[in-house]
């Protein structure tokens, strides 16, 4: 994401935002028609006052009750039209804004799902959450009011200029000659307000991240009695947010004060210059009255724009932060007309595979060549940082190889669709993630349209049915956020049941039992052995006693594949694997 010092050009933001109106163009057109009606209704009033005043001064006898009632009825009709138009703008216009906000949030979420693991490793979840939720809140008001307010303002300024010129050209030239001054103020303060609002958004994202971090680690916080430390961290972030708010309000105050001063000067110019013109016979009292009313309308329009400026800048800031994610490239993409990976057997080939992360040119893996047959069991062992998890992450294309290629059943995985590739691979991780919901929903997540019978059968295969049946509501038991109501072993068995239900031909076991106690590990290990039957399996192991029966064991270090062979071959070799195994 861009730093707060870098700002997208406003023209670019508007260009990217405008297409969201396309679906709602008729609503927008009607909204602008209604805006035109309200503007006309407002601008007619000074003309009526001018007419009545002129009649009162020059032809009081001609100003009959009938004429007054007709004028009153005419104005009443205008106000009814104005009220109906305002209702449409306030109701349907706001709904249009809300729909645009919804569309943008949908697009943002869809794009987030296309981004690679590296993006989420580099950006805080709290910041992302702020962008997909609070940053788009102001879009509703912005999408509704932005075209409407600027259209009304432009219309009022143009019509007012024409009418005022019709009343008195010299006075109008004086009034409008001073308008560029206000636009200079607008430009000066707008730039600074937008920077301040972006700092606010960034800081609230930091607060979200800090709160999320504390709440997710609340057990650690309580076990170390560090509530005060966390409170201090929160207070520090909260104070920084307050400071950014103060900065924003400082510029807002300067902006509003400057404009109130400008408004006062405008009235002063009209009153003094108008009075001088009047005593010299260059403008009539009725015309000066109407002129003052039009100037009042003009200044009210400018005041509305000024008041809208804060909302405008908040909206532009929200759009900018929205686009910062939308413009993040999806590193893992499908080729056009990619093939479906069908009837997968599970033969996997690594051809001269190398990999390094996008922010570091140092290879994590180099010259990896493997030929794994259907149903083979491959174990990966070695010290941390050797690339075991990275190698496994390349198979479902969580990351893409930077050198060489990987083939499944002879097909380059870059030439097949991501869905068909990932549907062929099941992953059981050490850090199990369960979604908020029931046990049934979490297991059924493994297969779209799974029946209750399917879920129960998968749970039985995973050795989870018995403990699930003993839960208060069985399969309908709510597991809590991230499965907090279940033990580590229970969560792991549910995740294994999920993979049983998916029934993939290729399986990746990423230290699936490393965080479990001995009793839970034995139960889960039995489930994993059932799951592995008939599949091509990659196992990242921390306890080497669990991989003795693997067809192939790879010992990975920072230098690549240090050793390769069966358990007995590596023991006989008395190398690194022998030393690691001897430690258990």
Q: Where would I find each of the regions flagged by the language model?
A:
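An intracellular "coupling" helix at the cytosolic face of ABC transporter transmembrane type-1 domains
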Residues: 25-26, 117-118, 134-143, 147, ...
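Alpha-helical transmembrane segments of multi-pass membrane proteins
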Residues: 33-34, 78-97, 148-155, 176-200, ...
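Short intracellular "coupling" helices and adjacent cytoplasmic loop segments at the cytosolic face
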Residues: 2-6, 98, 106-136, 209-233, ...
């Amino acid at each position: 994401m861009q730093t707060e010092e870098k700002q997208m050009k406003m023209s670019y933001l508007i260009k990217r935002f405008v297409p969201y109106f396309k679906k709602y163009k008729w609503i927008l057109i009607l909204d602008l028609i209604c805006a035109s009606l309200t503007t006309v209704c407002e601008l007619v009033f000074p003309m009526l006052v001018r007419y009545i005043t002129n009649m009162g001064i020059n032809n009081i006898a001609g100003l009959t009750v009938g004429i007054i009632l007709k004028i009153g009825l005419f104005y009443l009709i205008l106000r009814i039209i104005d009220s109906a138009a305002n209702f449409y703008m306030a109701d349907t216009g706001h709904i249009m804004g809300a729909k645009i906000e919804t569309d943008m949030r949908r697009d943002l979420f869809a794009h987030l799902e296309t981004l690679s693991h590296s993006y989420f490793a580099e950006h805080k979840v709290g910041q992302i959450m702020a962008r997909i939720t609070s940053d788009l809140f102001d879009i509703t008001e912005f999408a509704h009011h932005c075209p409407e307010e600027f259209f009304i303002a432009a219309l009022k300024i143009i019509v007012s200029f024409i009418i005022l010129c019709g009343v008195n050209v010299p006075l109008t030239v004086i009034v409008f000659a001073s308008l560029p001054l206000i636009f200079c103020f607008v430009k000066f303060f707008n730039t600074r307000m937008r920077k301040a609002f972006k700092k606010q958004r960034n800081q609230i994202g930091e607060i979200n991240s800090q709160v999320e971090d504390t709440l997710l680690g609340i057990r650690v916080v309580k076990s170390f009695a560090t509530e005060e430390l966390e409170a201090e961290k929160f207070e520090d972030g909260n104070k920084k947010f307050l400071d950014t708010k103060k900065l924003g309000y400082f510029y807002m105050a300067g902006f509003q004060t400057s404009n109130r001063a400008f408004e006062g000067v405008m009235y002063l110019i009209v009153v003094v210059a108008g009075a001088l013109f009047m005593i010299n016979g260059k403008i009539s009292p009725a015309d000066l009255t109407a002129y003052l009313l039009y100037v009042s309308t003009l200044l009210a329009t400018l005041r509305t724009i000024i008041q809208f400026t804060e909302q405008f800048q908040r909206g532009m800031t929200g759009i900018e932060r929205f686009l910062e994610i939308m413009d993040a490239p999806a590193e893992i993409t499908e080729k056009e007309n990619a093939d479906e990976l069908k009837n997968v057997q599970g033969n996997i080939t690594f051809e001269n595979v190398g990999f390094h992360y996008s922010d570091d040119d140092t290879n994590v893996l180099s010259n990896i060549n493997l030929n794994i047959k259907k149903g083979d069991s491959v174990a990966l062992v070695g010290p941390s940082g050797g690339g075991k998890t990275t190698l496994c992450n390349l198979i479902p294309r969580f990351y893409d190889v930077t050198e060489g290629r990987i083939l499944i059943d002879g097909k380059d995985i870059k030439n097949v669709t991501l869905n068909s590739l990932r549907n062929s691979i099941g992953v059981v991780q050490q850090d199990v993630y369960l979604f908020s919901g029931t046990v049934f929903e979490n297991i059924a997540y493994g297969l779209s349209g799974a029946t209750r019978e399917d879920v129960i059968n998968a749970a039985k295969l995973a050795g989870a049915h018995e403990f699930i049946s003993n839960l208060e509501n069985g399969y309908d038991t709510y597991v809590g956020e991230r499965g907090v109501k279940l033990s580590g072993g229970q969560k792991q068995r549910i995740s294994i049941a999920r993979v049983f239900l998916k029934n993939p031909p290729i399986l990746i076991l990423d230290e699936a039992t490393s965080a479990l106690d001995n009793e839970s590990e034995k139960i889960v290990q039995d489930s994993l052995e059932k799951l592995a039957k008939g599949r091509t399996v990659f196992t990242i192991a921390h306890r080497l006693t669990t991989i003795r029966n693997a067809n192939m064991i790879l010992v990975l270090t920072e230098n690549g594949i240090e050793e390769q062979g069966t358990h007995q071959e590596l023991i006989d070799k008395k190398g690194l694997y022998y030393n690691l195994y001897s430690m258990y």
